[in-house]
Amino acid sequence: MIKPIVKDILFLGQKSEEATKNDMVVIDDLIDTLRANLEHCVGLAANMIGVKKRILVFTVGNLIVPMINPVILKKEKPYETEESCLSLIGFRKTKRYETIEVTYLDRNFNKKKQVFNGFTAQIIQHEMDHFEGIII
């Protein structure tokens, strides 16, 4: 189900909790909401649709990839960039890493470990910041 994007900074500033199998419907809601916003958005964290759980989705080409309880294990090659967010107006400066290694659960709760580079790595870092209440 397509959900409205949360813009309440006080809500978005709160930390998210670990997701469980009971939160599976959130993945479908995130995917539906991202599809509805693809013109302006490449990723979403669950708190952006009002759910304080550690779930995110992002685009890779035509695919939408969900990540449950992701953790960055390694990060390399820091750089400065500017980002925008559906929850905010305009662009903000931030620090990101060119390469990250992430462990996460897929939508079937299978554990995965993967290396991401470039813009995909940037999207994942941005969405994971939401879990910590960090809004670029």
Curated annotation (Swiss-Prot):
Its cofactor is Fe(2+). It catalyses: N-terminal N-formyl-L-methionyl-[peptide] + H2O = N-terminal L-methionyl-[peptide] + formate. Binds 1 Fe(2+) ion. Fe cation binds at C85, H126, H130. GO terms for biological process: co-translational protein modification; translation. Gene3D superfamilies: Peptide deformylase. Signal peptide: none annotated. The active site is at E127. NCBIfam families: PRK09218.1 (NF006670). PANTHER family: PEPTIDE DEFORMYLASE (PTHR10458:SF22). Removes the formyl group from the N-terminal Met of newly synthesized proteins. Requires at least a dipeptide for an efficient rate of reaction. N-terminal L-methionine is a prerequisite for activity but the enzyme has broad specificity at other positions. This is Peptide deformylase. The gene is def.
